[in-house]
């Protein structure tokens, strides 16, 4: 198995401030919610910082080791303390609820933006990007980011406010002792920077392997039948084990670094508390003895409060370290999500075209010119890889209402021609004209809304048979839906279903046979009533009898419409106005069925070969 989109994992291990500023911008979209969280966290942090001050007051007033204790004001003290606890509890409940609400809002905003982006990307993106990769971005990465952003904001606000008040109180109590205690912060910053960079490196590798695992699961599920028929279970299991083992190793390394980081913070916090106890204790003894140290006068209440601040100060530092560690860990996810959001479609309309014709989300149908269906390739060059050109100086004219069939070996360029007509890709040089106008001067939606494309491998969407038939025309009435099904002889099998047109097809149409899915796909296109039909080996999944019925039915449908047919069974294109034999991206034979048979070339040989095969199969029956 091969995996795409992995270049993004190989980036420098450093925090990207612009990236996180952009992500945290999703939280700022709901400013009212953010302000509520801000106010709640400010109140909680202030109350947390007030507790050591109350402790200092209680010791110096009610205990007083240097004088006679007093109980004056103790009930007021209890009342104030209780009031602070109640207010803090209320605000804590509020910010927890609001943070959960923000998490959901961020998740919704990112997923909505990502889904809309996927609707606008060209086929080249999907050719290069696995479904497993996209699912991992849309589900696990977005969930990880929304959770981290929402709760990181909450934690960051509390840590910031609390540390600010702690620093202020410590410098207010004794600025010299405060400087001694805070001396451990610079080495903590250096250690944090080093470990965080290492964490990001291993987390990036782990997420890369996680994406591979998701792709492997997706391929394993989608290709289960092929795996079993080729007896690939053991080999697939070994390949999967290799991927999971690589992820396990990278995850363990990242976990070890994270586990090492927090004890370091705790140890440095203990050093700070010890410094407060040693120097502050000496100051208290000197004060009680009637002398002073270089720290000045320090009361017992001040020392206890200082120790409380010193020990609790490293809790927010530890939490901040955790936030930055999580950000380092999640940065790989953030990069991938934003990379998806920033992906530009290779095929896109100009701003001037969008202004006139609109976009897929805001079409301006009143400005759309009617399409007759005349198609011209004017000296077109095209390649997927520059080193492997597929079309060179390719010229072709398809008249409006003409049925043109494309025949050739696999890889000859038939599907490429179709993809260019549909503007799934654009020429590297040259022009493609629709009704005499370069189709790049008009919108993709203008063209594709007049296209009916039936693929060799049909895709149905979750829902009922009726929903799928009118997928391209949701406002179609019941009579139109049934008429479209009858035209392609799909109504026979539909009526045999227990729920008829209300039958659920399952994800991808899994509850129907390939032939049944193809019939529904035909009905869907006919109901959409396009001016240009594209049939890409569309009858290869249907039995011969049904195929003949469909051919007779769609002959009437295709009347006065342009149709391009990519055919494997040559018997299905005998009535085409023109048949083009494509080889190595060039037209080597051209004419109707009878003309090409008389020519005695590639088409003649291929047709006779298929005729003999069909005759043999009929004889075997």
Model-assigned labels for residue ranges:
Residues 1-48, 63-80, 95-99, 103, ...:
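Membrane-integrated ABC transporters
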Residues 8, 12-16, 39-43, 47-60, ...:
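Juxtamembrane helix-loop junctions of ABC transporter transmembrane domains
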Residues 24, 31-32, 123-124, 140-149, ...:
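An intracellular "coupling" helix at the cytosolic face of ABC transporter transmembrane type-1 domains
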Residues 34-91, 171-176, 285-300:
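Transmembrane helix-loop-helix hairpins at lipid-water interfaces of multipass membrane proteins
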Residues 39, 47-51, 91, 103, ...:
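Hydrophobic alpha-helical transmembrane segments of ABC transporter permease domains
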Residues 114, 118, 227, 337, ...:
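Helix-loop junctions and hydrophobic alpha-helical segments within the transmembrane domains
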Residues 357-621:
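ABC-type nucleotide-binding domain
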